[in-house]
Regions:
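Nucleic-acid substrate recognition interfaces
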Residues: 1-385
């Protein structure tokens, strides 16, 4: 499986100037190549390279390999756009978003990331330095900082290109690593995981990961955003963007911790992980006006992604099951009714009297559905006589 390792660069002022000039030149060249691809409706990388290669080198001061990387970046951007249109991510054929996306060439920000392959970038992991091509010449002994685990991953699994990124006044390199996947084991049982807003995750083992602190953190950021939005200045706009990224990083960190704990328990006990199939839930449920921001910021899909990739690295099977009525069905007598859940937190079966936390009951139902689904999937096909 492919993973990325992000290391922080520690450049000197002279190196910063060279990196900034290189990033600006590459993205200006990408803007030019994007206009050519749009005006001539070019889809092939080889065809666009024939049209733009010499102009990109001469007009923007790029060497041969960076010019090739710029052309590939443009072609990949248009390929991604066409895939998004086919998937319906930009709406129907004449929708405003789709018409806007198709009516102009793709633009590249001055500080957009730029890929470098091994001909333009070399790593010296023991010295924790890199050597990178710039428009001012080769910059050597560019120091970087990373954890020992990241260094081990880079040394063992780094492959392909790395991206140069500038974000929030800091420089980063994002390296692609091809990590081998262990074989998925046969689960002895399953851990059901119910995802929610008040409780971000609740397992059938009674482990509860509450979301109150994350909600308070989001409300605090919302108040700060409102104060900055009133000012309507450029500095306020910059601070708003920084705060948005900080809030997203915090939510990602919380999801990483939850996923790590759940996968560790599953790997240690030899069990699989069962999750609800929640794709499209925002289209099916229309919340009240004062609940829309809370539901829109609910990071349930990101938590599913984190659990899935961490489970793949550990060889733990992951199964998605039907989410309907998991918190309204009694796991003992299978009686299903909305009245079985009188409050958000409490479940009480009207038929057999089983009572308990509603999220735990939902997690147990998810676990039971995974047991049945896994048995059906692994039943051998009948032999033809």
């Amino acid at each position: 499986m492919k993973l990325v390792v992000r290391v922080k660069l520690l450049p000197t002022p002279v190196q910063v100037a060279a990196l900034a000039a290189t990033l600006h030149a590459c993205n200006e060249a990408a803007e030019y190549a994007s206009r050519v691809a749009f005006e001539r409706n070019v889809k092939s990388r080889n065809e666009l390279q024939k049209l733009c290669y010499h102009d990109v080198k001469d007009r923007f001061g790029l060497s041969a390999q960076p010019a090739v990387r710029v052309v590939k970046k443009v072609v990949d951007a248009y390929t991604t756009l066409r895939a998004s249109i086919r998937a319906g991510n930009l709406g129907a054929e004449k929708s405003r978003r789709r018409v806007k996306a198709e009516s102009k060439p793709i633009s590249f920000r001055r500080w957009a990331a730029q890929p470098f392959d091994d001909r333009c970038l070399s790593w010296r992991l023991d010295a924790r330095t890199v050597s990178i091509w710039t428009t001012a010449g080769r910059v050597k002994d560019l120091r970087f900082a990373c954890s020992p685990e990241q260094l081990t991953t880079l040394r063992a699994h780094r492959q392909g290109e790395s991206d140069l990124l500038f974000c929030d006044g800091m420089w980063f390199l994002i390296a692609t690593c091809e990590v081998p996947e262990p074989e998925v084991f046969e689960p002895a049982d399953w851990i059901g995981v119910d995802r929610g807003i008040t409780n971000l995750a609740t397992t059938s083992d009674l482990d509860n990961f509450q979301g109150r602190r994350l909600q308070r953190y989001r409300r605090w950021h919302a108040r700060k955003r409102a104060e900055l939005q009133v000012r309507r200045t450029k500095s306020a706009h910059r601070r708003l963007k920084k705060r948005a990224r900080r809030e997203a990083r915090h939510a990602t960190h919380v999801n990483h911790k939850i996923a790590k704990d759940i996968v560790a328990v599953a790997a240690r006990t030899g069990r699989g992980i069962a999750l609800e199939e929640l794709h499209g839930i925002r289209d099916r449920v229309r919340p009240h006006r004062h609940q829309r921001a809370t539901q829109s910021s609910w990071p349930f899909h990101q938590l599913e992604q984190h659990i899935t990739y961490k489970a793949r690295r550990a060889g733990v099977p992951v199964l998605l099951v039907d989410a309907r009525y998991t918190s309204q069905m009694c796991p003992r007598c299978k009686h299903t009714s909305r009245s079985d859940r009188p409050t958000r937190d409490r479940f009480c079966c009207r038929r057999c009297g089983l009572a308990g936390p509603a999220d735990v009951v939902a997690a147990v139902n998810i676990r039971d559905r995974a047991r049945r689904a896994w048995v059906l999937v692994n039943v051998p096909l009948p032999t033809v006589a």
